[in-house]
């Protein structure tokens, strides 16, 4: 895959990948999972994680697109982001429009976009009747990425649940931060591999958002099990937070019995992170990570050559920015700040 993209670097690529074959260095996990045609078709699949604010209809469909491609998603439902969503404008109940869902990642993502646009926007639209007939049955082989298809049922349930949230609103109302969060969690519920959930999420919210702070209290796992799809973390701006506020929030975390919300300290409320909180990310940016296995390091020189190999592979990965489906801002941001992460694993061995 890399040699095909960078033929002039063939010799160095082969040399550095000997470290991978010897288990001394690891490229991004997604590049190991989807190397070849999957990444050539959708370069975003080389990246482990991404971050975006939920501030437009496209944010919902892009989240579905990224999760189905194997990328973990950090997202912001901070008040100043969710407020940018247009008010609810319910579709005409007596005017119907059929939408045939394509049997692809893009097709599933488009179904979310069409649903959200039918409820959010300036113009009142027809009600959407979704046609799932083109989606391959459960257990069918996925030719490009491998594995087996989940069938249409997870997407059907996702659309029904999201529609339920939207129908509970009245025209002119805005989605709340918690409702926006729940919609993203319903999207994650639809992302399955072998019948098992495979979506990773972290939801960042405003520190004074009481609904989000308490969304995992009580028997939430029975009444709102979708909320288990995401870690929820309050964004605390370092130069604004007070000890009293922090301790009050900490007490609420203890009382929740769930260990949440988490606390995400930041200097800028526009920056987010990936679900593992390994790195600060700009809005619409990907996390590019390689790892060095340090469990059997023999010398400083040994460590140096491994880090050099990992940095080289990370640089190759950073060049995969010819995204499709995603808005242009994704490519602009990822190229402007081409992250090259090199971490260490095996320190405790």
Placement of each model-derived feature along the sequence:
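Extended catalytic cores of very large enzyme megasubunits
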Residues: 1-349
């Amino acid at each position: 895959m890399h040699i095909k993209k960078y033929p002039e670097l063939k010799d160095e690529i082969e040399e550095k990948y000997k470290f991978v074959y010897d288990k001394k260095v690891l490229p991004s996990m997604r590049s190991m999972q989807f190397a070849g045609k999957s990444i050539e078709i959708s370069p975003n699949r080389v990246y482990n994680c991404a971050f975006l604010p939920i501030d437009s209809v496209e944010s919902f469909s892009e989240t579905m697109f990224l999760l189905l491609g194997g990328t973990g998603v950090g997202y912001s439902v901070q008040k100043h982001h969710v407020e940018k969503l247009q008010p609810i404008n319910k579709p005409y109940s007596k005017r119907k429009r059929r939408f045939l869902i394509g049997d692809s990642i893009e097709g599933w993502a488009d179904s979310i976009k069409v649903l959200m646009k039918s409820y959010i926007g300036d113009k009142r639209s027809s009600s959407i009747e979704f046609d799932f007939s083109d989606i391959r049955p459960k257990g069918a082989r996925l030719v490009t990425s491998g594995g087996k298809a989940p069938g249409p049922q997870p997407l059907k349930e996702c659309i029904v649940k999201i529609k339920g949230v939207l129908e509970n609103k009245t025209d002119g109302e805005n989605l709340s931060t918690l409702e926006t969060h729940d919609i993203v969690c319903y999207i994650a519920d639809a992302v399955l591999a072998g019948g098992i959930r495979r979506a990773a999420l972290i939801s960042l919210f405003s520190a004074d958002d009481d609904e989000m702070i308490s969304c995992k209290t009580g028997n939430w796992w029975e009444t709102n099990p979708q909320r288990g799809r995401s870690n929820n973390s309050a964004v605390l701006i370092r130069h604004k937070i007070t000890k009293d506020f922090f301790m009050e929030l900490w007490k609420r975390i203890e009382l929740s019995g769930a260990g949440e919300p988490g606390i995400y300290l930041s200097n800028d409320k526009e920056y987010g992170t990936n679900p593992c909180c390994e790195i600060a990310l700009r809005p619409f940016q990907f996390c590019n990570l390689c790892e060095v296995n340090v469990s059997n390091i023999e010398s400083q020189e040994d460590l140096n050559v491994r880090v050099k190999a990992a940095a080289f592979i990370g640089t190759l990965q950073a060049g995969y920015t010819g995204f499709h489906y995603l808005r242009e801002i994704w490519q602009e941001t990822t190229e402007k700040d081409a992250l090259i992460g090199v971490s260490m694993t095996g320190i405790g061995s």
